[in-house]
From Swiss-Prot:
InterPro entries: cAMP-dep_PK_reg_su-like (IPR050503), cAMP_dep_PK_reg_su (IPR012198), cAMP_dep_PK_reg_su_I/II_a/b (IPR003117), cNMP-bd_CS (IPR018488), cNMP-bd_dom (IPR000595), cNMP-bd_dom_sf (IPR018490), RmlC-like_jellyroll (IPR014710). It is found in: Cytoplasm; Cell membrane. This is cAMP-dependent protein kinase type II-beta regulatory subunit. PANTHER family: CAMP-DEPENDENT PROTEIN KINASE REGULATORY CHAIN (PTHR11635), CAMP-DEPENDENT PROTEIN KINASE TYPE II-BETA REGULATORY SUBUNIT (PTHR11635:SF156). Belongs to the cAMP-dependent kinase regulatory chain family. Four types of regulatory chains are found: I-alpha, I-beta, II-alpha, and II-beta. Their expression varies among tissues and is in some cases constitutive and in others inducible. The gene is Prkar2b. 3',5'-cyclic AMP 1 binds at residues 152-273. The inactive form of the enzyme is composed of two regulatory chains and two catalytic chains. Activation by cAMP produces two active catalytic monomers and a regulatory dimer that binds four cAMP molecules. Interacts with PRKACA and PRKACB. Interacts with the phosphorylated form of PJA2. Forms a complex composed of PRKAR2B, GSK3B and GSKIP through GSKIP interaction; facilitates PKA-induced phosphorylation and regulates GSK3B activity. 3',5'-cyclic AMP 2 binds at residues 274-416. One of its GO terms (biological process) is modulation of chemical synaptic transmission.
Length: 416
């Protein structure tokens, strides 16, 4: 007998489990009643404004046109599948249409019905023996280059990163080869060294290509992080090479580190007013994908005119926002005038992501600054419910610019 798991059930139960572990309620039944009642009320309040509904207004035009923001090596179809890392393979896509799917290997591994429980707090650092795959200097250099922009690795300390690099192994693939298959157990996390790959998702027995990778990116993390079967099939469309990280090492280092990061940033993220519209499970995902960046006094964080690839939240310190405008006497020596300052809990860098245009201003650190950074893909995927708040801020920005420059600097209107 085949039992189909309803869409959204896994995420719903994961969010509830996290809340139970956080609060340790004495009356579990009463806690469950309050938790799901609150979720229902939040859902009713959001209504059609929820991200992904037909009524959404943000980003549609920019997404359809391809925008001007680099996609970090992964390109999505018109109704993209959305994931938790470098636009990987692990979340459900939009309803799929008919297509000629590639032939799937019939001798695939058994799909998981239930995965083992895992508590990162209870596992000792030396519980598992270290895994080391010897590498040549050339392989090590290529591996470091492939991993330098992987968000999951951003918060690892040097010793943890060294263990990850030691444990990764090279996997050569041929054109047409299936790297992972939807429904299989998660065994490895993969980082792309070279090659192109298509992402296929099957829905109601019908498969569809929902995106592709072009010589960079990573996939396979969510099946390992959340103990769920693979949610997509990744097929090589050219000869290529991958770096794989086994399940044991991934969970020992990455998942444990992620759990520590959750403890550190959960309360901070929950305190941010502009994220109040997110559900608990959505805020936890924000914690999972953010990276930490530290800037020294005077260091540039973003530059006016650059393409936008990240969104920033100030954790500590002070950030100065400046804009260049020729012909004004009150500008600083570098031709820029200060228009704002950001402090703890405030954000910047969202304007270029909301408007799909290059950076409208520059940002510099005043003293030592620590920021939480989120890449553009995660920003679009996770902060949909907050987008209306951010769009309302554009009017405030325009008023400030008119007062300073006599014009709104065309921060919203598309350029020719």
């Amino acid at each position: 007998m085949s039992i189909e798991i309803p869409a959204g059930l896994t995420e719903l139960l994961q969010g509830f489990t996290v809340e139970v572990l956080r609060h340790q309620p004495a009356d579990l039944l009463e806690f469950a009643l309050q938790h799901f009642t609150r979720l229902q009320q939040e859902n009713e309040r959001k209504g059609a404004a929820r991200f992904g509904h037909e009524g959404r207004t943000w980003g549609d035009a920019g997404a359809a046109a391809g925008g001007g923001i680099p996609s970090k090596g992964v390109n999505f179809a018109e109704e993209p599948m959305r994931s938790d890392s470098e636009n990987g393979e692990e979340e459900e896509a939009a309803e799929a249409g008919a297509f000629n799917a590639p032939v799937i290997n019939r001798f695939t591994r058994r799909a998981s019905v239930c995965a083992e429980a895992y508590n990162p707090d209870e596992e000792e650092d030396d519980a598992e023996s270290r895994i080391i795959h010897p590498k040549t200097d050339d392989q090590r250099n290529r591996l470091q280059e492939a991993c330098k922009d992987i968000l999951l690795f951003k918060n690892l300390d040097p010793e943890q990163m060294s263990q990850v690099l030691d444990a990764m192994f090279e996997k050569l693939v041929k054109e047409g080869e299936h790297v992972i298959d939807q429904g299989d157990d998660g065994d490895n996390f993969y980082v792309i060294d070279r090659g192109t790959f298509d992402i296929y998702v099957k829905c109601d027995g019908v498969g569809r290509c929902v995106g592709n990778y072009d010589n960079r990116g990573s996939f396979g993390e969510l099946a390992l992080m959340y103990n769920t079967p693979r949610a997509a099939t990744i097929t090589a469309t050219s000869p290529g090479a991958l770096w794989g990280l086994d399940r044991v090492t991934f969970r020992r280092i990455i998942v444990k580190n992620n759990a520590k990061k959750r403890k550190m940033y959960e309360s901070f993220i929950e305190s941010l007013p502009f994220l109040k519209s997110l559900e608990v499970s959505e805020r936890l995902k924000v914690v999972d994908v953010i990276g930490t960046k530290v800037y020294n006094d005077g260091e540039q964080i973003i530059a006016q005119g650059d393409l936008a690839d990240s969104f920033f939240i100030v954790e500590s310190g002070e950030v100065k926002i400046t804009m260049k405008r020729k012909g004004k006497s009150e500008v600083e020596e570098n031709g820029a005038v200060e228009i704002a300052r950001c402090f703890r809990g405030q954000y910047f860098g969202e304007l270029a992501l909301v408007t799909n245009k290059p950076r409208a201003a520059s940002a510099h650190a005043i003293g030592t600054v620590k920021c939480l950074a989120m890449d553009v893909q995660a920003f679009e995927r996770l902060l949909g419910p907050c987008m209306e708040i951010m769009k309302r801020n554009i009017a405030t920005y325009e008023e400030q610019l008119v007062a300073l420059f006599g014009t709104n600097m065309d921060i919203v209107e598309p350029t020719a």
